[in-house]
Regions:
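Aromatic-enriched hydrophobic runs in primary sequence
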Residues: 29, 41, 45, 58-59, ...
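Hydrophobic alpha-helical transmembrane segments and adjacent short intramembrane/lumenal linkers
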Residues: 73, 78-167, 171-175
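Juxtamembrane "helix-exit" motif on the non-cytosolic side of transmembrane helices
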Residues: 42-51, 109-116, 179-180
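Juxtamembrane boundary at the C-terminal end of a transmembrane helix
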Residues: 171-191
Length: 191
């Protein structure tokens, strides 16, 4: 929670702490992100948390944290590395608070409101309003990660943030929207 509320101070402090961590500690936060995504899908589709839906959705939505780790590897691999990569993964995923809160809110809307009202709330208010806030706040947190945890200059931290987002979001969009993108592009081009 500290990283979500005070990312600069949190990353400054946590980056100085000695931590040789193992693979489990490096992967626990990405696995938690995948788990929250899986639970969100279960709650949206059935208005209930069922192990069958949440478990399978966790597995197939695990590409999101994997894509983020690919982007993180590319951004961390540029220049000198100040943190071991497992530690960088753990610290980076500690900053996923805005997106996790957004997903929990989305789940609550779909679980506690009728479908017609849920569509209205998620289209106008939640996707654009709260989603925009989560996007901007998470970008700031990620910038603080690159700036303070990896000890980068402001310009370098900004470039690393853009590189990470470009790589990870391109992978996520290609996997999630891949089947729908070519027909939509063809329709816009009049093919």
């Amino acid at each position: 929670m500290w990283v979500t509320l005070c990312p600069a101070a949190a990353y400054r402090s946590r980056a100085r702490q000695p931590a040789a961590i193992g693979i489990w500690r490096a992967l626990r936060r990405p696995l938690f992100v995948a788990f929250v995504l899986g639970c969100t899908m279960s709650l949206i589709t059935s208005a209930g948390l069922t192990p069958r839906l949440a478990g399978s959705a966790t597995v197939y939505w695990s590409f999101v944290p994997l894509a983020e780790m690919v982007g993180l590897a590319a951004a961390c691999g540029r220049g000198g590395r100040t943190l071991a990569f497992p530690r960088a993964i753990d610290l980076f995923f500690a900053g996923h608070g805005p997106w996790l809160f957004w997903l929990i809110g989305l789940s609550a809307i779909w679980s506690f409101t009728p479908p017609i009202r849920a569509f209205a709330l998620t289209n106008a208010i939640w996707l654009y309003g709260a989603g925009g806030v989560a996007l901007v706040w998470s970008a700031y947190i990620d910038f603080c990660f690159f700036r303070f945890a990896l000890a980068r200059s402001m310009a370098r931290a900004g470039r690393d943030l853009v590189l990470h987002r470009l790589i990870s979001w391109t992978i996520i969009l290609a996997i999630f929207g891949g089947p729908a993108i070519p027909p939509a592009v063809a329709a816009r081009l009049g093919w």
